[in-house]
Amino acid sequence: NRSMANLTENFNYLQPTSFKLVLDRRNYPNLEFFCQSITHPGMILNPVELGIPRLSGIPIAGESLTFNELSTNIILDENMQGYGEMYNWMLRLVNNNLGSGSGKGSIASDTGVPDYADITLSILSSHNNQTKQVRYIDCIPTSLGDIQFESTADGQTFITFAAGFRFNYFKLV
């Protein structure tokens, strides 16, 4: 039976805590270290509707994919290093666009830091061995979430902030 030949031999279920996020370590070390959660984005194949009289449109596979945003949740350290890295990255992108009109892959002249960065999500087995990677290509930050300070929170609650990224595409490695 041909379909049985492709059936997985590993029947262990993926655990939600079995991941590691790697971003450009040289420029954004705290975003990687303090990443609490990541949501792998969905994608949509934009269909083309074929018009048939007296029938609703018949969908035909389109020519482009649309990816949702890559969403992360990051623990805020006391010095706000991770938040500062995202904030400065976003400011640098805006300043680059206003200034020289620099394009994809450009390097800001004053910092030497690339505008775009690849993000790699390593998926780990139940024994913490890497089983698969998802590589998000040419990411830019698109959102930096709110920070909520709360005087009634207990001492075991840590502040987190959301960070969103757009990317060109992803690869399963």
Residue ranges and their predicted role:
Residues 1-173:
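Glycine-rich, low-complexity intrinsically disordered segments
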